[in-house]
């Protein structure tokens, strides 16, 4: 794949309104150029998408649907659903899965009312699998199904059960104290299993699953990446079902071909905006932006949602770099005011680089507003405008903190930071497309779902990028704010931040089973948190994608198809 290795040159003077205007020194983040040239993206293709394969997929889907309807054992039904989810093809069978899990939930409720031991399976693995799948799909199930045997009494020999409990524990809420405690006990035993069996070939597949889970639990992983990984693992299992494996591979390649076409179109759009040409300090990350959109919603039916989401990601990246790196305080204050007023008539007051950015923003938001008005019958533009203005206001506050050397405490930082994370703006756009509910239900987007997702992204970003951003002279991030306020060490502050991320996930889990918002929106909000944990797991995957495994993720999802043999 072609790469440009040369460092980008950064403009060092403003776009002067008059020849006499003095030069202004600008900061530079020295972001690397895009690793994905437009011409290369246009060359992407998938040779596995053929007419006979399309017919084969139809037949395989019929076979799997038959399996779902005819599988009798309750544990076997749950295992089939779990396998379909992990392979990334469960979206084809939503009705069958909902029917099965509804029946499981009804039996669970009856057992509770009749005071029957709900740990009826006789083993930890099955109980934890049932718990995880029901919680994952929004059904109410209490932690007491485990009958208290989820702590020090765990059987070290039951690694399959311990792994199942470990995965289930990450669907806890704030009130599930026993379940949350089990994370410590299961993690300890799983790590011991990995160490003891490092040279044991008989336990290879299970050990691989355990290592993968310890790196990041299944509930917090990006579904599409997990499907790519699990298809390979599943193919090595002795109990593999060839029908499921073949469907997963064919479907992955078909969906990838759709994604490739969308990426080509978006790359052309990005090139035509001219933003990276005229604002050469901006991160050129259209491919990474689209990867994030796929992480939020990968299903073929959400093509327009991904297109809109990617454009929003790129506009946010551009504006963030203006505030974070390039703009003077005077320019940023003026830009914020004009965004607040949404006043195109004041365009001439802006320097040239800001004119292009603002006009591009206005055009894209108006287009989104047009489609929502056409398809749903209500005008969302005032809401969208307000969200961009609020985000820019938080960007401006952070710029002022930097210019003045002000050090906010942790609470003050987070009050500003959850909005500057851009998640409220992103999710508001998605809500407009996904739901027919009134926008007022979000409460000016200060809803627990939005706030929790924003907290995850804000803090995951901070944990990954703090050292780099501070090195170039940036505002203190959450880790440094906590250290400065409490006197804690960096390690202690990072552990504290990780704890807050965990609480945010607890709140998202609670909303999944109790919230009245559109279920697709709830899943998208959680997926945005998953994307954040993925992109920033090994470093700044947006600013330096080659150093944080983002490049590998892009290749596996958008470049390389799965071989069928």
UniProtKB/Swiss-Prot annotation:
Mg(2+) 2 binds at residues 320, 324. The Asp-Asp-Xaa-Xaa-Asp/Glu (DDXXD/E) motif is important for the catalytic activity, presumably through binding to Mg(2+). One of its GO terms (cellular component) is chloroplast stroma. The keyword Chloroplast applies. Belongs to the terpene synthase family. Tpsb subfamily. Residues 17-28 have a biased composition (Polar residues). Mg(2+) 3 binds at residues 461, 465, 469. The keyword Hydrolase does not apply. The gene is TPS03. It is found in: Cytoplasm; Plastid, Chloroplast stroma. It catalyses: (2E,6E)-farnesyl diphosphate = (3E,6E)-alpha-farnesene + diphosphate; (2E)-geranyl diphosphate = (E)-beta-ocimene + diphosphate. Residues 1-11 have a biased composition (Basic residues). Keywords: Chloroplast, Cytoplasm, Lyase, Magnesium, Manganese, Metal-binding, Plastid, Potassium, Transit peptide. Disulfide bonds: none annotated. SUPFAM superfamilies: Terpenoid cyclases/Protein prenyltransferases, Terpenoid synthases. Residues 1-25 form a transit peptide. InterPro entries: Isoprenoid_synthase_dom_sf, Terpene_cyclase-like_1_C, Terpene_cyclase_plant_C1, Terpene_synth_N, Terpene_synth_N_sf, Terpene_synthase-like, Terpene_synthase_metal-bd, Terpenoid_cyclase/PrenylTrfase. One of its GO terms (biological process) is response to insect. Predominantly involved in sesquiterpenes (C15) biosynthesis. Using FPP as substrate, the major product is (E,E)-alpha-farnesene with minor amounts of (Z,E)-alpha-farnesene and (E,E)-beta-farnesene. Using GPP as substrate, could also be able in vitro to synthesize monoterpene (C10) with (E)-beta-ocimene as the major product and with (Z)-beta-ocimene and myrcene as minor products. Its main location: cytoplasm. Its cofactor is Mg(2+); Mn(2+); K(+). Predominantly expressed in flowers but also in leaves, roots, stems and siliques. This is Terpenoid synthase 3, chloroplastic. It comes from Arabidopsis thaliana (Mouse-ear cress).
